[in-house]
Curated annotation (Swiss-Prot):
One of its GO terms (biological process) is ribosomal small subunit assembly. Its main location: cytoplasm. Residues 63-66 are annotated as: G3. Disulfide bonds: none annotated. Residues 199-283 form the KH type-2 domain. The gene is era. It comes from Xylella fastidiosa (strain M12). It holds the Pfam family KH_2. This is GTPase Era.
């Protein structure tokens, strides 16, 4: 008699310091890009659910902003609050760090998770940086001597290495139950939100070190017609000088932002996209909690 394996479903928070690859890991587990990524810290600013569905179960990943000690800036406070709030009503947590080192912000995240009493799985990301995996031994020794985890997984989210065992262990931590979302759903966020994030991703990528910290994107309009989405995106900065940086000489940089963002949207939405972009100034919006909330910061 064949024994049926019970279906499992639950929520898992993805926690860690900035720039360790939390969103890349979420995208890899979901199987498609739903969270934007860049080399800049604090790329992720909002909570987002990534829905990873497998024959054995469904993992609902709660991708979060990076935890950090600096909380003087209102935007940082709100992002820390969002990350901490993601621990409500989850069945387990993924603590993501990187293969090169463990620092004080990793300890901050560990202590936060340890206080919840939920199972915590450690993911050591970016192992593709090492040809000789024995180079990880000092870090693993330090972690094992000072911290306790349900399981530890060295992975490369970018190269999709080590994910099968991780998925198996995550499913084992979840309760038995029916899926929360249908099989074809990949996130709880709207296409409008995803469009704004894809524009912001390109702002970060195209500006690099010139990027003003206080840059955000608001969708002015989003209309769906058969075979075509029409989208208007406002890129907000705090100074006229920052506006000039985003636009670039003769509008070249803004044009490149629009072209690359449109290509990403067409790939995600599976339809043609007409995208317009503008840059506007709202002085000191990132220091005003009321203004932050109008831009969707929770």
């Amino acid at each position: 008699m064949t024994q049926t394996v019970p279906y499992r479903c639950g929520r898992i928070a993805v926690i860690g310091r900035p720039n360790v690859g939390k969103s890349t890991l979420t995208n890899a587990l979901v199987g498609t890009k739903i969270s934007i990524v860049s080399n800049r810290p604090q790329t992720t600013r909002h909570r987002l659910l990534g829905i990873a569905t497998f024959p054995e179960g469904q993992i609902v990943l709660v991708d979060t902003p990076g935890l950090h000690r600096e909380q003087k800036h209102p935007m940082n406070r709100l992002m820390n609050r969002t990350a901490r709030g993601s621990l409500e009503d989850v069945d387990a947590a993924l603590l993501v760090t990187e293969s090169t080192h463990w620092n004080e912000e990793d300890t901050l995240a560990y202590n936060l998770l340890n206080d919840t009493g939920i199972p915590v799985v450690l993911v050591i990301n970016k192992i593709d940086r090492f040809k000789d995996k024995s180079a990880l031994l000092p870090l693993l020794t330090h972690i094992n001597e000072n911290h306790t985890f349900a399981t530890i997984h060295p992975v490369s989210a970018l190269k999709r290495k080590g994910l099968e065992t991780l998925v198996s262990d995550l499913l084992a931590l979840l309760p038995e139950g029916d899926p929360m979302f249908s099989e074809d759903e990949i996130t709880d966020r709207s296409q409008r939100f995803l469009a704004s994030e894809l524009v912001r991703e390109q702002v970060m990528r195209q500006l690099g070190e010139e990027l003003p910290y206080a840059t955000t994107v608001e969708i002015e309009y989003f209309t769906e017609n058969t075979g075509l989405f029409r989208i208007g995106a406002l890129i907000w900065v705090e100074r006229e000088s920052q506006k000039a940086i985003v636009i670039g000489k003769g509008g070249a940089r803004l044009k490149e932002i629009g072209v690359k963002a449109r290509q990403q949207m067409e790939r995600l939405f599976q339809t043609k996209v007409f995208l317009e972009t503008w840059v506007r100034v709202r002085k000191d919006w990132s220091n005003n909690e009321a203004a932050l909330k109008t831009f969707g910061y929770e």
